[in-house]
Amino acid sequence: MLFGYLVGFLAADPEERMTSGGKRVVVLRLGVKSRVGSKDETVWCRCNIWNNRYDKMIPYLKKGSSVIVAGELSVESYMGRDGSPQASISVSVDTLKFNSGSSRPESRGSDEGRQRSNDNVSLGFEGESLDTEIALDKEVYAGFGEDQQYASEDVPF
């Protein structure tokens, strides 16, 4: 099983669907910023929330909302419009949290307001918390660029 955390912005309002078997699924389209060298890229992920999980949060999720998603990751392949093979990332959502440490200027309040709103941010796992104050003044990128704590030869792929 491949499990991961994603931090990003919703590309659209959540979509509610029903499978052919009658199961309810809410689909979030999540844009996750990443940096490759000096180039910024956005990786698009489809996040599936099954059955009635997070029903009380769904009405508050809108296009542009910043969220933290944790769940089982899978890669799916499909044929692009031009006939070339493409890949997409899909997440079966286990944990969903609002990200009050947004880097979008229109969603930032005063520093004092952001500090108060970040006091109790957690990822939903026992003893594990996210210190969003560290990331508040940086863009939301995987690895934060040069601050990575591993050498490139340590990465197995």
Curated annotation (Swiss-Prot):
One of its GO terms (molecular function) is single-stranded DNA binding. PROSITE patterns: SSB (PS50935). InterPro entries: NA-bd_OB-fold, Primosome_PriB/ssb, ssDNA-bd. Residues 1-100 form the SSB domain. SUPFAM superfamilies: Nucleic acid-binding proteins. It holds the Pfam family SSB. GO terms for cellular component: nucleoid. The keyword DNA-binding applies. Signal peptide: none annotated. Keywords: DNA-binding. GO terms for biological process: DNA replication. It comes from the Bacteria. Residues 97-126 are annotated as: Disordered. Residues 105-117 have a biased composition (Basic and acidic residues). CDD domains: SSB_OBF. HAMAP family: SSB (MF_00984). Homotetramer. This is Single-stranded DNA-binding protein.
